[in-house]
A protein has these predicted regions:
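Conserved pre-motif I regulatory segment
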Residues: 10-54
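Charged, low-complexity intrinsically disordered regions
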Residues: 1-11
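Walker A/P-loop
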Residues: 48-68
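SF2 helicase catalytic motif II
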Residues: 129-132
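Conserved Walker A/P-loop ATP-binding site and its immediately adjacent core
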Residues: 62-72, 76-100
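Conserved RecA-like helicase motor-core motifs
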Residues: 101-109
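Residue-level preference for the first positions of well-ordered beta-strands
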Residues: 50-54, 79-81, 113-115
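Conserved two-lobed SF2 helicase motor
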Residues: 110-126
Length: 132
């Protein structure tokens, strides 16, 4: 019985495997203001399709994430929902302006602009079908 449970679990895990295949697209915009390492990370995340940009404090996660989000919006023709902790929502929108990315803060589920910034606690207000 224990072997059967282990085999069932292994089959379950195999079904969840995504493999290393890319499911994204070729980047449409990689601005010159990104450092080489940032450009490489954003390029990888866009091509991968299902990836996460993880970087230490001060390495530019916000501009990298905003460029990623802008690429998704440009590719899909829909806004991208960009989630942040509540403490940095406004800062993210301000940085978007600095980095020439159209971003707006929304608390109520309205989707407007290229990138819609909100916090985790407000996610239930948003319809995923409105976003790329």
């Amino acid at each position: 019985m224990a072997d059967e449970s282990v085999n069932d679990y292994l089959r379950f895990l195999e079904e969840k495997t995504q493999g290393g295949a890319n499911s994204g697209f070729e980047p449409l915009w990689l601005p010159d203001y990104l450092f080489d390492f940032q450009r490489h990370m954003v390029d990888w995340a866009i091509r991968k399709g299902r990836g996460e940009i993880m970087a230490d404090c001060g390495l530019g996660k916000t501009p990298m994430g905003l460029v990623w989000a802008s690429n998704v919006a440009r590719k899909t023709g829909k806004p991208t929902l960009y989630l942040t902790p509540v403490a940095v929502c406004i800062q993210t929108v301000e940085e978007a302006e600095k980095f020439h990315v159209e971003a707006r803060y929304s608390r109520d589920g309205s989707s407007f602009g290229h990138v819609v910034v909100t916090n985790y606690e407000k996610l239930h207000h948003f319809n995923p079908h409105d976003f790329g």
